[in-house]
Every structure is written in C-alpha cells, then in structure tokens.
Amino acid sequence: MSSALPPFRPSLVSDPLSARQDPSLPGILPVSAPILIEDIGPRVSDGRYPIKRVLGEGVVVSAAVFRDGHVPLAAALLWRRSPRPGEPAGGRGAWHEVPLTQIEPGLARWRARFDPPAIGRFDYLIEAWSDDWAGWRHDTLIKRDAGLDLSLEVLEGMALIEATIARIDGTDQAADQGLLSSWLADAQGLETAGGRATLMLSETLDAVMARHPDRSGAVRSGPPLSVVVDPPRAGFAAWYEMAPRSQASEPGRWGTFADCAARLPDIRAMGFDTLYLMPIHPIGRIHRKGPNNSLKAGPDDPGSPYAIGAAEGGHTAIHPELGTLDEFRALVAQAGEMGMDVALDIAIQCAPDHPWVSEHPEWFEFRPDGTIKYAENPPKKYQDIVNLAFWGPHRQELWLALLEVFTFWAEQGVRVFRVDNPHTKPVPFWEWLIATVKARYPDCIFLAEAFTRPPMMKMLAKIGFTQSYSYFTWRTTKAELTSYMEELVEDDPADYMRVNFFANTPDILPFHLQTGGRPAFMQRLVLAATLSSVYGIHNGFELCENAAIPGKEEYADSEKYDFKPRDWNAEGNIKDLIAKVNWIRNENPALQAFRTLRFFRADNDQILFYGKMTGDRANIILVAVNLDPHAGQGGLLWLPLAEMGLSDGQPFIVEELLSGTRLEWTGSPHHYWFDPATNPAAIFRITP
C-alpha cells in the first residue's frame, strides 16, 4: 500500500478580469481590455464546484457581456474535456467553440449551448471581443442612407480588409484570403467613394469577414468553470432496495445470491432498473444486536448488516451465508443482462471484531481505560459499531484502505454505491475519494444517504455525490411538498443536487404509511416517481407493510436485525401499480427530467397538481394526487394552457395513463374526483 495519497487539487474559480500594471502609469491604474464578462451561469459556489448533467443533456451557458461605448461585440463559448489526474495540460485537447447569441440586448445577456460528448468532466468559459467590422458596417450603412460623404469610411473599411487578409493563416483559408484580395482590388478600381462603399457593404463580403474576426484583444471570463457529465441513470432511475438475507423462499434460512437472482424477473417486471443491496459483508459477533435492536442476540440471530467485519473478513469480504465472490459476480452479470445495475451499500464503520481493529488499532479511537470507543449519537448508542479515526495521525493509510474498498467492488462490476451516513465523515475525504474513483471509473454513481442539515446535504452534493437522499419522506402536505420541490428545482441546488426520493427505508417507516393503509402507499409511490426522476422503495413497500414500533418511525421486527421472508404476491400488494407507473415513466421523456417540474392550481388543499413537459412540448405530462388517504377528494384543476401552447378555446386530447381513459377537453379548469382506494392519483398526457 502506498504511503501517500494521490493528489487532488480542486479548481478554484473566479472571474474578475486579470489586470496588469503599466509601469508608465501610477500604480493605482490597471491596464486591461475594455470588455467585461459578468454573471456567468450556471455555476456553483462562484465556480468552486462543478455543475452536474447527464450524458445527452446539454449545458446552456449565459452571461452579461458588455463594454463602454457602442462598439458591437462578439462572443463564443469555449469547452473541452478537463485534464485527468496526472495528465499533462496538453492532453485534454483543443478548445471547441460555439458562438454566443445575444438574447436580451437591453440586459447585455448572451447565451450558447454545448453538448458534452461523453461521460466525464468538462471545462467551459466565455471569450468575447470587439467586432470592429460589424461596427464599421453598421455606422457606414446609416451614413450612406443619410446621404453623407463616405470617403473616410471607405478608407477605414479598406484598412480593416487589409488587416484581415494579413491575419488569415493556413492553406484551408486561402480561398477566403483570395476573395478578400479580389474585393479590395475591385474597390480600389472604382472611382467614387459611393461605389466603393456599395461593394464593401455587400452581404457576401460581410459573411467572409465574419469568419475571420480580429480576436487579438479578446477577453476570457477567467479560470474555467466545470461540468460533471454522469451516465443517464444518474438522472433517471428506479431503485429497488433489498435485504439479501431475507430473499429465501422459505423461513428459517439465510437468503443467498442465488435467491436474489431468482427474484430479478419479478423486480424487473415491476420496472426497476437498479437493484440496491444492503451490506453483504461478514457481521461482527461482539455486542451483536438482537431482534428490534435489542442488546442481547441469540445464537441464531443474524445481527445488523451495518456492523461490518468478523473473522471471515471485512469490507471486501462476503458473508459466507450469502455465497461466494463468484456468485456475487454472477448476480451482477445476470442483473446487467436484464438491464439492471447492482448498487452496493457501503457503510464506513466496523464491528469490534473487524480485522482492521486487530491489524490496525491506530485507525481507531480508544477511551482512557483502553477500551475501543463505540459509535454514539447521544442518547443513542451503537455498541456493535466502532468508528474510524479519520483525522488521526495514520489517516493516509486509512484513507487509502477505504479507497481500495470502493475500487475492489468496482473491479467486480459494481458502478453504483449507496454510502451510509456520509455526513459523519470528513467532507475533504469524500471529495478526494470520489474524484479518485471516478478518474478510474467515470461511470460510477454515488448516492449520499444523509438525513442531516441542509448545508451539509448540499455540500456533499457539491463535492461529488451523484445523488442525494432528501426530506421528501417527511413532506406530506400540499404546502410542504410545493415549497420543498420549488426549492430543489428553482433555487441554487438545481444545478448540482439530484434527489433520490425513497418512499421508505429499512430505518424509516413514516407515520403517514403507518396510518394511511394501502391508499397511502399508492399515493406516495406516485408522488416519489413523478416528482423526482430518480426514486426508490425498500422491499416490502410493494406489500404495503406498515407494522411499526409504537410511537416510532421504525418497522416492528425490522430486517435490519432479523430475517424476513415474504410472500411476494400476498393479497393487497401494489405491484401492478408500480409496474404501470414505471412503464409510464419510461414511455414519457417529460418524467425523465427533474428541473422542469412546475406546480399548477388546484382548488383543494388535499389535491397536489403539477407537471413536466419537454422543451419542444412534444411530451406534456400533468399529475394530480389526492393527499388524503382516508377520504375521497375532488376539485378544479387549472391547466397551464399557455405553457402547453394551447388557446383557451382549443380542444385537446387527454389520456389518463393509469386507467387508460381517453378524453377530449377544451379550455380550463376541469373538475376531477379521486377515490383513495381506487384512483388516488391521475397522470394525464396532453396531446394538442
């Protein structure tokens, strides 16, 4: 194991114009170009962190570009692949260029778009310059139309053409050089200034001159900004979480990887594309937890899979009851053949009998009496877990060992990692680790399971986590859902934080699922799957399991501490609804995006009405959900006709995709009724 951490140097970005001092002027007078480039977007924390996109999603960049006076400007968006760690600067290739278009002249706003061609990290910046030829042509046209003498203007224009001829370089541009020389000679052969001006003001000449601007005085916006381009499933996916040991078809034995593989067709039939496994490693025996988190475990109690490590191995080992490494690889391969990724749960914590405790005691914290310090979140105590000393004197060796955990599983074919409680580990550690892993495996996806304060959740997203857990689990009212979603899609997080909406987790059985019965499960499924483009459920959700420890948001007899074999086709399941909702998501591109979410008016506080549409309006989806699982609700739905490109009297086709109903509506509003037991939600596809 190397004793030094691989280098990681985050890019600090700001965009003031660089100034140089002219020694002939007083020291307080900087000499700089007259062009200013301000308010570049998108950017995160003034460019300190990259924005995020998925492959196939373009990056629209805008800025204010202006200068003193009335000289016309031109600008371009420059982009290229970012250098990889250890790669020389020249290895990333030349800048690609896209012209900027002025979209709001009164505000000096310019905009352009580029489409990164691959997964990875890309840099971008703006370059602007004064367009002297456009300025000359604009002023000369006005003077000609006013009947003014153009003698001096002609001389100025000729000088600009001569400078362009001299500036053109390269055999591929020789044709333009010849054209300009011919035009110049023809103009010089004319006797009158008016005749020369007419020739020089031709649109054909203007097009040639525009191809060769004088950019010697061009200004760049400063150090480049960056975008991380992730695989499409970083932005659109449906996760199914399972406890592998609970997948046995009969009670009383451990589930195996073979049992997990046997369930793949059923999971895929429900429309899930990411199979998320709770930790699969050996489980500690010291202070092992019993059922319902009890402190006493019986001889046959399996313990918590989050108490990682025992005599059989640690974070790169597999619990022997689950199977072998070859059988795990076979599960990953079989899932891949069915169009599914396998996500692995990585919990950076150790059982007291994890091999690292005896092999590397310097990686842990000990109390004054010599006992190892176990994990606490007062008043909660986790006697079966000990934490690592991330800032201890041996942190380099520890950090490298943890890096090897992720790269080991990546080598087994895993490209998706759900990280347990990352907010309890140092942010610099995650920034370094994720960047290092993605330098080797750029298609890796990291999900941050961090239910914590918003600044920490946002920071984890900024420094590299691909997806984030969210507060959706606890947002239940119309006001709460609307406010929270608008914060995510319209405010600062939109460019860097992708939320994965889990309707439940092994740890969390929300009160609304405990009390709302089957209608609550149907309601929350539709909300999670249509509000966000990435969502998930923990196994048992499809069976509407809601037995809880009284007064707590915790499952009774949780499979975190026990086996839980099930009849996966038990009466009352909502598997058909899940399959239908996932089919709708896959068939409608509007639902595969997140930042296009908008809320619309519904005249009932128990009805949430919202929608998404593609930029070209080719796919328009509106969703209405009854938030009351106990009673039917109805109300007027006010459709956004203008946003959909419809006039008030124009008829349009409405398909309610959950029921298959097809309607013809005209105008807005329209009344709709929701029965929590039979139609707790409606998903409308609008066709003008």
From Swiss-Prot:
Q: Which residues form the active site?
A: 420 (nucleophile), 449 (proton donor)
Catalyzed reaction equations: alpha-maltose 1-phosphate + [(1->4)-alpha-D-glucosyl](n) = [(1->4)-alpha-D-glucosyl](n+2) + phosphate
Q: Where does alpha-maltose 1-phosphate bind?
A: 289, 349, 384, 421, 560-561
- The protein's name is Alpha-1,4-glucan:maltose-1-phosphate maltosyltransferase
Provide a Gene Ontology MF annotation, just one: hexosyltransferase activity
Query: Which keywords does the record carry?
Result: Carbohydrate metabolism, Glycosyltransferase, Transferase
Which Pfam family, just one, is annotated for this protein?
GlgE_dom_N_S
**CDD domains membership:** AmyAc_GlgE_like (cd11344)
Function as written in the Swiss-Prot or TrEMBL entry: Maltosyltransferase that uses maltose 1-phosphate (M1P) as the sugar donor to elongate linear or branched alpha-(1->4)-glucans. Is involved in a branched alpha-glucan biosynthetic pathway from trehalose, together with TreS, Mak and GlgB.
Show the taxonomic lineage: Bacteria, Pseudomonadati, Pseudomonadota, Alphaproteobacteria, Rhodospirillales
Q: Which organism is it from?
A: Rhodospirillum rubrum (strain ATCC 11170 / ATH 1.1.1 / DSM 467 / LMG 4362 / NCIMB 8255 / S1)
Q: What class of enzyme is it?
A: transferase
Single Gene Ontology BP annotation:
alpha-glucan biosynthetic process
